[in-house]
Amino acid sequence: MPANDAAPESSRPFDLIAFDLDGTVFASPNNQLVSPRVYAALQAAHDSGALVAVASGRPLWMIGEQIPEAPWLDYAITCNGARVVGTRRSDLDFSHSIPRPLAEKLLALITEYGGTGSIHTDVESLMEKRHCEKIAQDLAERDAKTDDAAAHSGSPTSNEGRGNPIDAVLSLFSGSGVDSMLDAFLARPTQQLDKVDCTMPSSDSADKLIAKLTELGGIGIARMDAKTPEFTSAAASKGAALVELCRRLGIVPSRAVAFGDSGNDLSMCGRGITFVAMGNATAEVKAAADDQTDTVWEDGVATWLEPRLGISAPEASA
């Protein structure tokens, strides 16, 4: 069994642990840090011999500085499964980008239906400035909710002023601002398109775009809310990538556990993997999950792992 060989298989409850970021281990996108309790639980899981993977909609350069440098991280499933990389070894890296002709049609249709968005290629993120303004508004609303939830859970949050909203979003997510993601992609003929984050002007326009793309074929769709779809290759999803990673590692999916809270985590359900919904997950995610834990503000990943690993929560520092 090719876990990290720290302990025999019989002594550990899982061989692979995967976790989403925003709403799962990040209480706010503005604060890209794992809490000390969750960090300790993931370290304990790794020490038991389990492999640990992040499973995010973000590309690798958007997941912050702490997680890529964590000694317990082995793999990064990025862009909703479009690209998987090893943080310690590269022989198992794989990707499913959208073929360029199809990618160009996708971006043209988003524009035609009035949408705005950001694209993540194999080397960079190109974010429409209109989309950055929308993201800034969403972050402010999320921070307001996070502050309220944290006030009840005792968890700290980061809600500092960030100046110009477009520049703040580009800095936070390590992106480059563009006027048109289609024009920017056409100007980079060697790049591969892994994922598109999209905001539509209405749920009706999102429905029409998704219907058109479904008719076109070849596009994977994860709907975060009524107006916010995410697009990848049809071959890419977090769940498909996690199962493929298990196959390449020789791990039986039933020996894997995954944590998530939103629409792009649903693909990890129903694949033989134990999927655990966060307490703050959407109703749809909770209904599909195998189990449920506490909220992200209550360190839900840790509270689920600790009893199964036979460890106690670390004592809070004075």
Language model segments and positions:
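Mg2+-dependent phosphoryl-transfer enzymes with acidic/Ser/Thr/Gly-rich catalytic loops
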Residues: P2, P8-L16, S35, T214, ...
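Active-site T/S-Asp motif of two-component receiver
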Residues: F19
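Active-site phosphate-binding/coordination module
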Residues: P36-N159
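Short active-site oxyanion
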Residues: S48-A53, L73-D74, K195, S254-A256, ...
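Short, structured coil segments at secondary-structure junctions
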Residues: E69-W72, C79-N80, L216-G217, R271-G272, ...
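Conserved acidic, metal-coordinating active-site core of Asp-based
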Residues: Y113-T116, H120-V257
